[in-house]
Amino acid sequence: MVDVCLLGTGGMMPLPDRWLSALLVRCEGHVVLLDCGEGTQISWRYTGWSFRDLDAIVFTHLHADHVAGLPGILYALAFADRQEPVRIIGPVGTAQVVAALRSIVPTLPFPVETLELSGTSELELPGGLLLRALPVTHRIPCFAYTLHRPRGRRFDPQRAQALGIPMTLWHRLQRGETVEFAGQLLTPDLVLGPPRRGITVAFVTDTRPTPELPGFVAGADLLVCEGMYGDTALLPRAIERGHMLMQEAAELARAASVERLWLTHFSPSLTDPEAWLPAIRAIFPASEIGPVHQTVTLRYRDA
């Protein structure tokens, strides 16, 4: 299972009743933070999640409302007695931004590692999560991300017994290893069922719709997507500034056949996002305004 918790739904600047958009994802006790705008550590403290469990911080892009909260988060980790390395991942320029922000938190009890992405990427994170990155269309380099938790194939003990495979080898086959027994090579396919769907969380913000996005987030259990404006008359502004309308987020969710959509990253001018939900749900019924500070658990589905 995978836990998710949205830390805010704001874009551009925090407001008295709206924190900036950021997302926590937890699997097997390991936490990933997607974006880290001003005030992220304050919003985090409403959740009950442990700072010490944070292994990776992932930036979509390097605008201030997505990175300026980094010094506070690093301080929070230090006071939580974090000693293990923390990885910071983002587009080209991330190392320079991290170095600048770290100048006011120069001494930390843990190493900080940076990794810059320059194109479509895939890498493993702690907790068995697979991070995928897709370049999207904003005013500066920006990425959409998915975090995927694979699910192992089901082991068939009756089949293993029928083949005379000793129980001492079962766990290796279940892990996907090929083993040798009685002069034969035994492959996992002999005793494992068909592939099973895992759990996928998609995070898309600060972009115009692109042809690649529906396939990239296809079938996600949860799509967290920006809806900068609700008024379709503001489409020219969205195009100019590299953002999506709430309606465009819903159209993406529908095209990608995701399970549910959380809308986030609202313009400060969008004072009542809830007012637009009827129109949004007419496009994609499983849409909601992102629930801030609520931990939601995503579980494996057999289908």
Curated annotation (Swiss-Prot):
> Quaternary arrangement and interactors, per the entry?
Homodimer.
The reply to whether Zinc figures as a keyword in the UniProt entry is yes
UniProt cofactor(s): Zn(2+)
Belongs to which family? Belongs to the RNase Z family.
Residues involved in Zn(2+) 2 binding: 65-66, 206, 265
- GO MF term (any one): 3'-tRNA processing endoribonuclease activity
Question: Active site annotated at which positions?
Answer: 65 (proton acceptor)
User: Which EC number(s) are documented for this chain?
Assistant: 3.1.26.11
State the free-text cofactor note: Binds 2 Zn(2+) ions.
| SUPFAM superfamilies cross-referenced by the UniProt entry | Metallo-hydrolase/oxidoreductase
Q: Which reaction is this enzyme known to catalyze?
A: Endonucleolytic cleavage of RNA, removing extra 3' nucleotides from tRNA precursor, generating 3' termini of tRNAs. A 3'-hydroxy group is left at the tRNA terminus and a 5'-phosphoryl group is left at the trailer molecule
Task: Give the taxonomic lineage as stored in the record.
Answer: Bacteria, Pseudomonadati, Thermomicrobiota, Thermomicrobia, Thermomicrobiales
What's this protein's function?
Answer: Zinc phosphodiesterase, which displays some tRNA 3'-processing endonuclease activity. Probably involved in tRNA maturation, by removing a 3'-trailer from precursor tRNA.
Q: Which UniProt keywords apply?
A: Endonuclease, Hydrolase, Metal-binding, Nuclease, tRNA processing, Zinc
Query: This protein is called what?
Result: Ribonuclease Z
Q: What PANTHER family does the record point to?
A: ZINC PHOSPHODIESTERASE ELAC PROTEIN 1 (PTHR46018:SF2)
